[in-house]
């Protein structure tokens, strides 16, 4: 699309000085056949460096948007760079790489299985739900031959879907093609290692009824990103509800004229990034109603500013505490000339910086992810560890935390080792905290599986 030449290796090859994007270390590395190669020895080298370089030099302390635009980081890819030479035969990639779906054993006698680590697995689940299939989620990884199926893998048992037995094979084939996933058919429920397909610990997951709050005090940007993620990319319908509807007993749905809003109609409530108006919207009575709804089995997903608000200090909604960065009351801050304050404050901000994160991939919120993740950080809010908090995503160690972009040593020390993604059980329901934007501008997509899991997997667990 942008006139950049991309090549693919026809053989295995080795680079003696390859810099690992994740750790920053330079090492000898062997790459397998099929590896994609983008050389900077081409006319679009400036564009390539802008979107592919691990880090860019930043001279100013004040930035408009974000401090890194590295595509390998944004999509959480395993990537390396080198300034040295290498030798390998290549072919030019002339067409966009498509996710071609397929079914292995299309007349399976027992079950069909979709590995949840596939990029488009959530789309497949949405399509299964649309056709009223009963689906289970694998509680832990299992192994068949030399293939690993990750935790969260979708299991469609033939015996649990007898009403669709006549059309199942054709519908499964169509879903594989439409979603662009590989589906494997099983003639038996037995596996080589791990829990068998019909094991009771593999959890039934049903299509949730999902509501997304929109309009002030919530960010229209974040709300739009979340809606786009589900409505367009995943194909899972969600209702947009005006935030003010929570303050009224009978108010129209977003885009509707007569239907009223009742939290009991929903299984999942998503709160986008919100600002100072949250305390006005969520007064004691509203908080009590939401707490009752969660206790009865609802899943509350609070993101960014809304996640910060639903902590003990701001709303007393849970026992989870927010670690706030201490206010600068130094003599220097108080005595700065007016024309120096913007630059001084800019150095204390985190303007969209890529940080290394550790992920608990055994938790349903992280199903399908790798154990390491690049999260995009704005601001300094972070959750403190708590016995009630199931920590799923935490910032890395101080010496490896900052991958790309700017963050002061004080900010990095403040964040290191603390939690940005976690889950709290409350009665029969759950509160999901996502301090960082998991799908920023639908560009920083590496963490987006957490949002999909929060909606599609968490309610079943």
Give the ranges of each region predicted by the language model.
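Intrinsic-disorder/low-complexity accessory segments
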Residues: 1-461
């Amino acid at each position: 699309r942008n006139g950049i030449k991309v090549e693919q290796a026809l053989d295995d090859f080795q680079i003696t000085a390859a810099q690992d994007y994740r750790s920053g270390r330079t090492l000898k590395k062997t790459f397998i056949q099929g590896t994609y190669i983008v050389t900077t020895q081409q006319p679009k080298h400036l564009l390539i460096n802008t979107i592919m370089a691990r880090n860019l030099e930043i001279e100013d302390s004040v930035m408009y948007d974000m401090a890194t635009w590295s595509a390998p980081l944004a999509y959480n890819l395993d990537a390396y760079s080198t300034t040295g030479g290498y030798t390998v035969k290549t072919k030019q990639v002339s067409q966009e790489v498509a996710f071609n779906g397929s079914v292995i054993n299309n007349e399976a006698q027992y079950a069909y299985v979709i590995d949840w680590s596939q990029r488009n697995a959530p789309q497949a689940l949405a399509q299964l739900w649309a056709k009223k299939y009963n689906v289970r989620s694998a509680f832990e990884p299992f192994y068949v031959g030399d293939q690993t199926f990750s935790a969260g893998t979708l299991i469609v048992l033939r015996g649990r879907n007898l009403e669709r037995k006549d059309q199942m094979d054709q519908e499964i084939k169509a879903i594989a093609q439409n979603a662009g996933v590989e589906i494997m058919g099983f003639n038996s429920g037995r596996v080589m290692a791990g829990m068998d397909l019909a094991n009771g610990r593999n959890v039934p997951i049903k299509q949730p009824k999902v509501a997304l709050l929109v309009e002030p005090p919530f960010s229209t940007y974040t709300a739009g990103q979340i809606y786009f993620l589900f409505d367009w990319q995943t194909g899972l319908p969600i209702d947009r509800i005006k935030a003010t509807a929570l303050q009224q007993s009978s108010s129209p749905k977003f885009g509707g004229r007569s239907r009223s809003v009742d939290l009991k109609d929903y299984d999942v409530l998503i709160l986008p990034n919100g600002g100072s108006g949250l305390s006005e919207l969520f007064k004691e009575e509203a908080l009590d109603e939401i707490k009752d709804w969660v206790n009865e089995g609802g899943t509350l997903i609070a993101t960014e500013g809304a996640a910060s608000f639903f902590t003990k200090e701001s709303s007393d909604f849970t026992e989870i505490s927010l670690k706030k960065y201490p206010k600068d009351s130094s003599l220097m801050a108080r005595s700065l000339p007016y024309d120096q304050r913007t630059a001084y404050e800019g150095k204390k901000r985190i303007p969209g910086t890529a940080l290394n994160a550790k992920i608990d991939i055994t938790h349903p919120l992280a199903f399908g992810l790798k154990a390491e993740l690049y999260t995009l950080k704005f601001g300094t809010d972070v959750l403190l560890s708590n016995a009630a908090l199931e920590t799923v995503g935490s910032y890395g160690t101080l010496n490896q935390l900052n991958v790309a972009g700017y963050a002061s040593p004080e900010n990095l020390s403040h964040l290191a080792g603390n939690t940005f993604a976690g889950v709290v059980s409350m009665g029969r329901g759950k509160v999901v905290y996502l301090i960082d934007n998991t799908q920023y501008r639908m560009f920083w997509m590496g963490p987006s599986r957490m949002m999909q899991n929060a909606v599609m997997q968490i309610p079943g667990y």
